[in-house]
UniProtKB/Swiss-Prot annotation:
It comes from the Bacteria. Belongs to the acyl carrier protein (ACP) family. GO terms for biological process: lipid A biosynthetic process. The gene is acpP. This is Acyl carrier protein. It comes from Chelativorans sp. (strain BNC1). One of its GO terms (molecular function) is acyl binding.
Length: 78
């Protein structure tokens, strides 16, 4: 797992209070990890702060899984 993936995983575990074993790249924030719409907004804000990137609303709507977040952040920080 990349450094970015590890950092994303840590944020998800802290914000959603889920077991780290459940946070896989395929895990859906809503369907698998129990996030609601407010949780997803807070996660996006936490990702922006942690990685120093801006995630516009239209992009945030496409980030549905942990893997989506990792890919977006890695592309934005490349």
């Amino acid at each position: 797992m990349s450094d970015t993936a590890e950092r994303v995983k840590k944020i998800v575990v802290e914000h959603l209070g889920v077991d780290a074993d459940k946070v896989t790249e395929q895990a859906s924030f809503i369907d698998d990890l129990g996030a609601d719409s407010l949780d997803t907004v807070e996660l996006v804000m936490a990702f922006e702060e942690e990685f120093g990137v801006e995630i516009p609303d239209d992009a945030a709507e496409t980030i549905l899984t942990v893997g989506d977040a990792v890919k977006y952040i890695e592309k934005a920080t490349a």
